[in-house]
Amino acid sequence: MLAFLYLAILVTTCGKPENELHLYIWADYIKPELIERFEKEYQCHVVYDAFDTNESMYAKLKLGATGYDVIFPSGYTYELMLQQNMLDQIQVEALPNLKNLDPKYLPDVQEQGQFIYAVPFAISYSGVAYRKDKTQVNERSWSIFGRTDLKGRMTMLNDIREALGAALKYLGYSANTLNKSEINQAADQLIEWKKNLAKFESEQNKHGIASAEYIVVQGYNGDMLQVMRENANVDFFIPKEGSIISIDYAVIPKYAQNTKLAHAFINFLLNAGVAAENMQFTQFSSPNKAAFALLPESMQNNPALFPPQEILDKSDVIKYLGKEGDLYNQAWDRVKKS
């Protein structure tokens, strides 16, 4: 693994042409045809690497990878990167399409109205996907992972905040709690659920649920809606106890070599038509308010894509917790060792 990371770092620290844009993104995150359109409009070449968790992305950057122009971390990782002075300023005047964003998503990233450090790009809600042809679900709850009849046929995300967050929501706690007792209770709950899991994993849950290798998986709504588009036997729900919400941001790292093209790409993604087209590809919702009106009604009215207010009221956006967040690392270590 380390050898792979060092090789990746070697590759991404090499020099590159001025008309090349390097992205570090989630898999299946931007419609390929949109990237081709950008390349044609700006006479450039886009190169991208994919990551599967915020933790792996952050670890690679901390090991010294310095070849990226735009990165797409989730909120709590963005906050960590900002605190560690890893991000460059994004100039507001270079983003005329910023007006398309819902203003409620901007206060956390705004600085004096002149520049920002991040642009809200996508919103994901974690929940549960299951095979309708293999099992019945009578209660749309995180408690499904306690079902012994599905032992060995379920997975949960290999992600500290998502897995522990699911247990915290099930117990009625905040996914951002710093109460040691509550976090330990969540770890105990997760250890109980672990007895029924095939494993914790974040890379193969889409394929696993599509092939029926797994009958129930914890996953992100967009990923699971992509599977449902191709497989009518798969369904997805956001549990009644609430979801763990991640807001992904476009950021420009301090070392970016092509900031002009990086700004152009972010502004391109903020175009209402582009954002709507990408939403239809990824099935992840967007803070782009102007794009919502361009979506088909089937997407506008899909509760898995745009959850009802009663679910949102019970859900939590994952926050960076600073050093106190080590309580989660300790709890996760206990779960993994159990």
How would you label these PLM feature ranges?
Residues 127-134, 169-170, 246-261, 266, ...:
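A bilobed periplasmic-binding-protein/Venus flytrap-type ligand-binding module shared by bacterial periplasmic
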Residues 82-90, 112-116, 226-238, 300-302:
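Ligand-binding "clamshell"
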